[in-house]
């Protein structure tokens, strides 16, 4: 059982404990490095253009996985994050069309804050109603998807070239400049990682995920923490939506985009070492896993596997690794 005081009062550096907590995350990053090295052998002219493509196109799922990780660590799960991606993508494309970069940035800030407040209210509903997270968020996913279609009935809209450059390193959305995408990923991920491990609220989320009753008895405001977890998840899902509109240059309200993104985010969270039972894992591992989940498709394509078969292989691999990750996470939790 993990409590806030247990985590916060630790004064020495326990290498054994660190290995138990971060060993899987490190392994996921090593696996990602191996896959990239393998991919360079499959592509004859692998270079900065391919690096930029991987960096920018994995941004949406990476943001979504980090948001999902925060919620799952707190003992919940959000099946509506993918729908928030679609909704914010549609709103951004509609509002940013033919606007200046400055106005687009103001709109982006408003969208992120609005999504955080909106999803934070979902956390409040879950806490007050005691209805399981999976039921409430499944319902909100349909609400968000319907709102997306009201905002943007079909693919369309647009975004300023300067806004696209911030995420893709190119005003056209393509090119070999991968630094902007990496910077856009690192800043929020590091901020969330520090929040989870260095702030009292972040440590409270681990305590709640480990044992909500014990956390409550130790003085943790579990309701407030639940709201914050869902607010952070909503804000990061909005970041995923903004990254999507920056990459594609248009909005797309299709329901399938959101549902696929949600399932992939859950897969990335588990693959990254976060236990679905809560209280275990890190957002750093979830990022590496998200890139791997995204990366499987181009790898299978480079191997010459047809798209239909590739989807079966990809799903099977993810399922197997998720089961292994779940078993190891459970074993690690029992060891602690």
Predicted segments with their positions:
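Membrane-interfacial amphipathic/re-entrant helices at transmembrane-helix boundaries
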Residues: 1-65, 101-106, 335-336
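Inter-helical junctions in multi-pass inner-membrane proteins, predominant
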Residues: 42-53, 149-155, 196-197, 230-268, ...
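Transmembrane alpha-helical segments in multi-pass inner-membrane proteins
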Residues: 237, 252-315
